[in-house]
């Protein structure tokens, strides 16, 4: 029987790949790639030639059984996403679950994921936070946000550059234009940008020009009442 490795890849700067990730990619028989063209660039950078199989959100349900059979047949497989850690707002969960159901050993390597540097760069509390990933674009979006209205922990969202301003406006309407937030863009790349301010200030900043790159929004949680305020509410 083979084995499944989940291998994180750089979120922008190719030099951020770990030595262990390189060793695993050298060793495996097959690399499952979210986009084979993107992964080929990384493999070429590392001087590697591998069998590449396409494995993305549009084909994973149809492909997962075949992949598991391949591993059960003795092949060692690595799953990578275009950037970051597989399974975090990327394909991976379904394959991992199916492998475990079939007794296949799964090993996940530690490595890059965009929300960690964005969270730390924000300056907001990192002790407790909730990762929301990509919000639904239409169905269920309002309900999801309504569920977060009372959230006191720092919240983290992924967003596309094309929807950033629209999402910030929606956040301002729900959470208040004076709620503190931060936006990280193009993390680890040449034009990395980290902007912090109120939601209104962020709307003004990113409305001034075209937004490009991968986006992480970090939203401060609902401020907790001071103890004397909470006591007053109880007395009322």
Question: Which residues fall in each region the model found?
Answer:
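Glycine/small-residue-rich loop that forms an oxyanion/phosphate-binding "nest" at active or ligand-binding sites
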Residues: 56, 64-113
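A charged, well-structured terminal subsegment
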Residues: 70, 140-156, 174, 218
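A contiguous loop/helix-start segment that scaffolds small-molecule binding in enzyme catalytic cores
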Residues: 75, 154, 158-236
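Short active-site oxyanion
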Residues: 25-31, 104-106, 154-155
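Class I SAM-dependent methyltransferase SAM-binding "motif I" and its flanking Rossmann-like core
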Residues: 94-151
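Short glycine-rich anion-binding loops that position phosphate/pyrophosphate groups of nucleotides
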Residues: 11-14, 82-86, 161-163, 222-224
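Conserved helicase motor
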Residues: 54-61, 134-136
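Glycine-rich, flexible N-terminal cofactor/catalytic loop recognition
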Residues: 1-57
């Amino acid at each position: 029987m083979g084995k499944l490795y989940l291998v994180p890849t750089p979120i922008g700067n190719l030099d951020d790949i770990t030595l262990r990730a390189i060793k695993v990619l050298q060793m495996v028989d097959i690399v499952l790639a979210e986009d084979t063209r993107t992964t080929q660039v990384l493999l070429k950078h590392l001087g590697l030639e591998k069998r590449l199989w396409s494995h993305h959100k549009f084909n994973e349900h149809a492909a997962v059984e075949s992949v598991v059979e391949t591993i059960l047949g003795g092949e060692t497989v690595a799953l990578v996403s275009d950037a970051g850690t597989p399974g975090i707002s990327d394909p991976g969960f379904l394959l991992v679950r199916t492998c475990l159901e079939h007794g296949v050993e799964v090993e996940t390597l530690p490595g890059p994921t965009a929300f960690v540097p964005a969270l730390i760069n924000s300056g907001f509390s990192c002790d407790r936070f909730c990762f929301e990933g990509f919000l639904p674009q239409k169905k269920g979006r309002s309900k999801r946000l309504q569920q977060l209205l009372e959230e006191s922990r720092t919240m983290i969202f992924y967003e596309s550059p094309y929807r950033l301003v629209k999402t910030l406006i929606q956040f301002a309407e729900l959470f208040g234009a004076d709620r503190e937030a931060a936006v990280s863009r193009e993390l680890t790349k040449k034009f990395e940008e980290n902007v912090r301010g109120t939601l209104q200030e962020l709307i003004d900043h990113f409305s001034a020009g075209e937004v490009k790159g991968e986006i992480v929004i970090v939203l401060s949680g609902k401020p907790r009442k001071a103890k004397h305020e909470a006591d007053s509410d109880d007395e009322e």
